[in-house]
């Protein structure tokens, strides 16, 4: 079985990736700090992956998550980590207070590079939901405020979330590509 270096310091992301890809490829974790540029989701993902492949001198997989508020024309997008850190769950809800439209889209973008100098390939998944006041255990980012069909991600068990999440959808595409192209 081939091995891939998943570049993350987030143990929750690592567990999800290993659970979904584990039967296709061995996922090793490399917790290195890769600087992120500002730009579109795709630009950020590709540049992060290029730098990761150079750093590990081998195959690299990186992930970037965005949360797009439709009422705010896609903001905060790829900057959700910083918005969440600064505002918290309540503050993010307050951003949408003036708007009727509480719809949001979770976007997960994985980028894979076979090594230094190789152009990264993008695999993206999206899940539509709506912003709600925080419910459930706050173990993983904005899960308590992202509602999908009546439950927040934080209220779902891991297996249920892994079947419908933006991350799962992106990983399903990556998994298929790995099986067909990178055996």
Curated annotation (Swiss-Prot):
Domain of life: Eukaryota
Annotated positions binding Mg(2+): 36
UniProt KW Transport keyword: no
Cystines in this chain: none
Keywords: Cytoplasm, Hydrolase, Magnesium, Manganese, Metal-binding, Nucleotide metabolism, Nucleotide-binding, Nucleus
Subunit structure of this chain's protein: Homodimer.
Protein's UniProt name: Inosine triphosphate pyrophosphatase
Originating species: Ajellomyces capsulatus (strain G186AR / H82 / ATCC MYA-2454 / RMSCC 2432)
């Amino acid at each position: 079985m081939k091995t891939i270096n998943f570049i993350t310091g987030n143990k929750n992301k690592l567990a999800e990736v290993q659970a979904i890809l584990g039967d296709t490829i061995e996922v090793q974790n490399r917790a290195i700090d890769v600087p992120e540029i500002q730009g579109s989701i795709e630009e950020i993902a590709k540049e992060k992956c290029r730098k990761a492949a150079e750093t590990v001198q081998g195959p690299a997989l990186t992930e970037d998550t965005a949360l797009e508020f439709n009422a705010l024309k896609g903001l905060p997008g790829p900057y959700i980590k910083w918005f969440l850190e600064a505002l918290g769950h309540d503050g993010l809800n307050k951003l949408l207070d003036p708007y009727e439209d509480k719809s949001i889209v979770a976007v997960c973008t994985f980028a894979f590079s076979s090594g230094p100098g190789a152009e990264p390939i993008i695999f993206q998944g999206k899940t539509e939901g709506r912003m709600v006041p925080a419910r459930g255990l706050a173990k993983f980012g904005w899960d308590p405020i992202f509602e999908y069909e009546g439950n927040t991600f934080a209220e779902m068990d891991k297996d249920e979330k892994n079947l419908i999440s933006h991350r799962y959808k992106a990983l399903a595409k990556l998994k298929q590509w790995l099986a067909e192209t990178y055996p």
